[in-house]
């Protein structure tokens, strides 16, 4: 059914749909948007209702049957879908162009109110290759929803297919498992406040006009700046670093920026990820499953700014209770010489046995001689990193504590 013609405002609206870069007609692979449905409703107005209403029903029924949270993944979404389902960006291809496009696509869906979103890592259609899959695995480890997925006709592209990609996966997927407490906390804030998990830089730095045109870097929450390598054969990557102090999350090297581009040399096994000075996040130890990771002790990473304070938070629950879950909420603050962890809510029983392994403080300019709790396990003057071990004091995450050093 087609009711075409330049005068048909429903089939030929004054905008284009950028679908896989093809800018197809709005009715492509569907019935005419000028067609009338039951109730005298135009397809133009009703087309997107199918996906969102199916999402609502599927999510509701699954939760009623299991009496716990469901996880529904949908490609057909609409504003409001984010309260019910996750989204993936559709049938991409194993190309460098689609790797690049994945970043702004994911960021836009976060702004649409669909925070749990990701692209098919390594590409859905076509044959991926070692370099592309290595770069995509590193990048995809920081998607809100991370999944390597391709069609049945395409060659296998699991991380074990290429030894190099296996090494990349161990590093970056391993880091994702470490960051799950932080990512889960971002999911909590997305749920109750509407903040995207993956954010364009301009959202965190709205007065910095240099961030407005950045398409391929992104913030994971307010704390982590991800600078993907998106070009084939690249041996360096240039990213913009807003004013402040930024610490590499892998080797703790520091960038002090007034708001400028920085070029970093990269091997196949590198992707710059920096924690923002002034933020604090909680991490687990790496593991093979999220269930196993949740049973490991916490490390708390404190990134001190050049001057002033740092803060962060942690949200914990059982991951399954649907409404009014029993939760523990912890607030972290730090300044020069002091770190404080304050429990604001303490209803999740699982937090009672969750130990804090160590507190890592970045930006400590001189070696301290003593700490008020635990012991100094390391001070590295090159990275200005202080590590305070709490393993001997059996400090749990659900009780207040303060550490001072001098």
Predicted regions and their residues:
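Solvent-exposed beta-strand/loop surfaces of large extracellular or lumenal domains
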Residues: 249-268, 370-391
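Accessory, solvent-exposed terminal regions and/or long lumenal/extracellular loops of proteins
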Residues: 273-374, 385, 390-398, 405-406
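Intrinsic disorder/low-complexity detector
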Residues: 8-14, 20-21, 30, 169, ...
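Polar/charged alpha-helical tracts
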Residues: 198, 253, 335-336, 381-383, ...
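Intrinsic disorder/low-structure terminal segments
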Residues: 9, 14, 70, 142-144, ...
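Generic beta-strand structural signal
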Residues: 219-220, 241, 334, 379-381
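Catalytic-domain carbohydrate-binding cleft regions of carbohydrate-active enzymes
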Residues: 1-276
